[in-house]
Amino acid sequence: MRTRPPPVAPRRRRPLLGLLRLILSSLWLALVVVAPLTAAWVASSLAAHAGASTRLALASALLVFPVVPLLWEAFAAWRRARRPATRRFLTLSDRLVLRTLAVSFVFVGALLARNPQRAFEALNGRGDWMLDGRHDRRAETARRTLFRVAAKSAWLYHLADAPPPRPQPLPEREVARVTPTPSGTGPTPSGDEPAPVLPAPPRDPHAWPWPADGPHAAVLALTPADETSPAAVGRFLAAHEHDQWHLARAVHDYVADRIAYDVVSYRTHRFPPQDAETTFRTRLSVCAGYAALFTAVGRAAGLTVETVVGRARHAVTDGMGEGHAWNAVKLDDRWYLIDTTWDAGGVDAEGFHKRYGTSYFLTPPEVFLSKHYPDEDRWQLLPVARTPGEFLRMPPLRPQFFGYGLRLVSPDRAESDARAFVNVVIDNPRHVWMMVSVRPDGGEETRCEVSRGTSTTARCPLNGRDLHEVVFFASNQRYGSYEGVGSLSVHNR
């Protein structure tokens, strides 16, 4: 008599296991979409940063991913057909996903490894190229998301950063000064005759900018007998100036007045010692020596002083800039920023030219950080520290731009795109006189058509598909010298 086999118990469903499989499958498939899109974003951002065709870069990147993985799969199938049959563990879908991921990683890795610093600047500066001209809520949300992702690429910049000792940047460059023709011929700084230049509002005696009316009286009173060491100078200045704010000014003026920039060392990248004693003795240094001497003299005078290191730039094309050093001084329980190097003078092809200034003395942090970026976030002196990407996107404006009471309205980015011409809008509540010029890379400068008022507007022609530099000049007088106060870059699309 046959016995019946025991009934097979039905398999118990495991909903958690099924949910886990669904989640993993979804993530697996999402990777095959996200990876190629990331590669296309990197490639097109690099193209936008270089002024090349973003459409071509985007199309090329997207074309690679369906084509290369499929060709790879076809080649693998051809090789498999010529061998004895073996069992496959992966489905066709799994193999295509893995091949797509491999191609994506190689493609992105090659783009990043070729020039990590340029890749960082492209993602953080032009990573939102596809949103140019759009400022609606969705566009701004997408822009913030893209730049949050781009900010994660900061390791690329640090990877490419040169190890100490780093080359130091030149002092603030001699900016071209232009003198408009008084006659009615040719371009003029404005159209109709507007109201006269409005005076600046009354200033606090400690408020920035401080008047550049010459070195402090205590500095002028120094004799060779008083100037035997940094400590002796600090004690002398403290004995002749009891106000802490003006004492800081005296220390600043001493360093900016006594030290010349070492152009030869900068250009040969062979730097002698940059300590305070050597700088004091030789009267020659790059920025590290300026900062070290300010620290030594300031501390000897009884001030709380620190040396700050970071990066500084002159123009948009400098990216994050070069290694630089400056100072921070504590007055009335608050920290302030000082750059004696850039207040000492300027450099051109002939060498260093002494030109005393106070633009970088106790400069407001938001103004100072237009061209300086410290290695430590705490020395930004801002409630919320700016990221390297935010620094890159800011136009490099000189302190004089803010000293004239100006505010850049549009374009509000260091680097942007335009077609045939670009309109520049600057808020100008004091009615200062302005000129704007545009120059293509390697080309000749062209004056822009400027209309003047509480809002200055300039229409600048873009000639050729090159990168153009737009430079702003300002003056309190219509006729005479106009000083450069800032610049930005525009790609002609």
Regions found by a protein language model. Give the residues of each.
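Mixed-charge, low-complexity segments
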Residues: 2-162, 168, 236-237, 348, ...
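Secondary-structure boundary elements
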Residues: 185-286, 295
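Residue-level preference for alpha-helix termini and adjacent loops
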Residues: 236, 258-260, 279, 337, ...
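Short linear motifs at secondary-structure transitions and domain/linker junctions
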Residues: 263-265, 299-305, 356, 398-401, ...
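Short, surface-exposed, charged/polar-biased interaction segments
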Residues: 269-276, 319, 348, 382
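Hydrophobic/aromatic-rich core segments of domains that either
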Residues: 289-368
